[in-house]
């Protein structure tokens, strides 16, 4: 065995119990294990950074979903970027930067027959930085791209509203809608986030939901109604937009972060009859359904980053896997500003 590899220790975070409400320290178990030499056809990767996403809260729950729950005792699922440190696969060389699903751990190995299924793929740092590969060029960007373009189907001149506008998915959706010739209205929490999406990202307007004036803001900024609503939050904000739909509107259901830590029943829409009155459509989307088209979206979005039509903002937390529990909860308390990333190592 490689003597350098044999000296490495893999620090991990495992799911110890299923949260009720906001995850606590009791829901996590810190563990470590030696790093093993990769087998025939396998690739060993050092994790450099992890993508922290609202969807992770749903993965901790039991029950039917679009992806199996994380098992108790299993390393917590997470996307990330890393660098290959050992390879017995001709498709990957030592030093290659890759994206994939490492989980919350410092090293991960992918068997040769699992590489495609795992999503392990080389990334080109000429197209974007490591953190941009977790943001606009990663799962959030793919979610925003296919959710808006395939489900929302925006047309030039239409009004697009996106909640969670300063977050990872929201910033991609809003900028892409602007590039496609739409009027863009964001909904975000706090004056600083609203100012940023208007001043830096080019949104036409942004409504601060913390001001309690979402309905009034929609009336002011969407006088002809909402043609496309990209929903990342659910709850009262979804209901407010439902009451302001234009005829033939499309609602993209991407997430409901306002509801993820409820200890009771999830709040459903009250104004759903607006769908009937306005001949509107509300459709859920899961980004993994579009995996075979990721290269198309990455090429387009990378072009926008290069020519300056699109910007990205990442909120990078340091501290390695030990910082994971606290960092994850930043998503659910509104403390992150931009795409939340947990840095594990330089590289």
Please provide the spans of the model-predicted regions.
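N-terminal Rossmann-like NAD(P) cofactor-binding module of classical short-chain dehydrogenase/reductase
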Residues: 99, 161, 207, 229-230
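C-terminal hydrophobic helical "lid"/dimerization subdomain
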Residues: 2-8, 288-347
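Short amphipathic alpha-helix with an adjacent loop that forms part of the alpha/beta core around
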Residues: 213-223
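NAD(P)H dinucleotide-binding glycine-rich loop of Rossmann-like/cofactor-binding domains
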Residues: 76-83, 93-164, 310
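Glycine-rich beta-strand-centered segment in the early N-terminal region that forms part
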Residues: 34-52, 60-104
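Mid-domain Rossmann-like dinucleotide-binding core that forms the NAD(H)/NADP(H) cofactor-binding site
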Residues: 134-212
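Glycine-rich phosphate-binding loop and adjacent beta-alpha segment
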Residues: 236-310, 343-347
């Amino acid at each position: 065995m490689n003597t350098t590899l044999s000296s490495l220790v893999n620090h991990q975070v495992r799911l110890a119990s299923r949260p009720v409400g906001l995850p606590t320290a009791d829901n996590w178990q810190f563990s470590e294990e030696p790093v093993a030499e990769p087998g025939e056809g396998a690739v060993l990767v050092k994790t450099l950074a992890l993508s922290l996403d609202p969807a992770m809260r749903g993965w901790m729950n039991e029950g039917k979903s679009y992806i199996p729950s994380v098992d108790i005792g299993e390393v917590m699922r997470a996307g990330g970027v890393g660098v290959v440190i050992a390879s017995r696969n001709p498709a990957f060389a030592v030093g290659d930067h890759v994206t994939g699903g490492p989980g919350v751990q410092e090293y991960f190995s992918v068997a040769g027959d699992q590489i495609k299924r795992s999503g392990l793929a080389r990334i080109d740092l000429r197209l974007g930085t490591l953190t941009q590969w977790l943001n606009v060029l990663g799962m959030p960007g793919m979610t925003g791209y296919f959710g808006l373009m395939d489900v929302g189907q925006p047309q030039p001149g239409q009004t697009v509203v996106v909640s969670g506008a300063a977050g990872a998915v929201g910033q991609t959706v809003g900028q892409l809608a602007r590039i496609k010739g739409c009027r863009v209205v964001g909904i975000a929490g706090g004056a600083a986030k609203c100012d940023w999406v208007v001043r830096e990202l080019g949104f036409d307007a942004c409504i601060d939901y913390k001001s309690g004036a979402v309905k009034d803001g929609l009336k002011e900024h969407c006088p002809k109604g909402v043609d496309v609503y990209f929903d990342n939050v659910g709850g009262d904000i979804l209901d407010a937009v439902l009451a302001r739909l234009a005829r033939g509107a499309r609602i993209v259901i991407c997430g409901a972060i306002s509801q993820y830590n409820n200890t009771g029943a999830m709040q459903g829409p009250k104004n759903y009859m607006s769908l009937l009155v306005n001949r509107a459509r509300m459709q859920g989307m899961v980004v993994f359904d579009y995996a075979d088209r990721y290269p198309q979206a990455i090429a387009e979005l990378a072009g926008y980053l290069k020519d300056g039509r699109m910007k990205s903002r990442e909120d990078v937390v340091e501290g390695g896997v030990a910082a994971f529990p606290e960092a994850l909860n930043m998503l659910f308390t509104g403390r992150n500003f931009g795409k939340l990333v947990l840095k594990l190592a330089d590289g």
